[in-house]
Amino acid sequence: MNSLVLPLCLLALFGFSQGELLVTKKVYFDIKIGNEPIGRIVMGLFGNVVPRTTENFYQLCTGQNGYGYTGSKFHRVIPKFMIQGGDFTKGDGTGGKSIYGAKFADENFQLEHYGAGWLSMANAGQDANESQFFVTTVKCPWLDGRHVVFGKVLEGMDIVKHIEQMPTDSTDRPIEDVVISESGAIELDTPFAVDKTGVGADEEEE
């Protein structure tokens, strides 16, 4: 019996089946459109695959360093592609700040943009990660190997889809402000597995 303990522990720590990933941290965004609260997006992060990227996003969600996502906006929305946010320094997609004090390197490209509901780092080129991120609304294989995937939407994909459908201007900025009114962490007692699939039955596969 004891001979089974170590393999089972290793399985729990480092993953389940080949088609699953282990969520090690949970975070949330409470969203407002204008002054109207519309709901919460809950996201799972993969700290065993991309620990530095996960920690950056986690600490920016909690605001434990005195800065982070609370009060920032989704500044770029493209239907059948993604919604982008995380620029809490300038608010227009030209700013951002990581917990590491500078842009940090692409950690790895082990994870792919498997479908709708995946979190990935926005960047201005190779090894240029700060705080900007995006949430996919379709499968995006052309981004694999270029943007670091680090999380998945667990709850609130309907909120993501609502944002995706909002009217935008010529720069893809929502006409009405989409604000992260509050962000933070959700206690996670035990890591759990999620599938490498898109979120939502109506996901586009293009």
Swiss-Prot record:
Gene3D superfamilies: Cyclophilin-like. Keywords: Glycoprotein, Isomerase, Rotamase, Secreted, Signal. Its main location: secreted. Pfam families: Pro_isomerase (PF00160). It is an enzyme of class 5 (isomerase). It catalyses: [protein]-peptidylproline (omega=180) = [protein]-peptidylproline (omega=0). Glycans are attached at residue 129. It comes from the Eukaryota. This is Putative peptidyl-prolyl cis-trans isomerase.
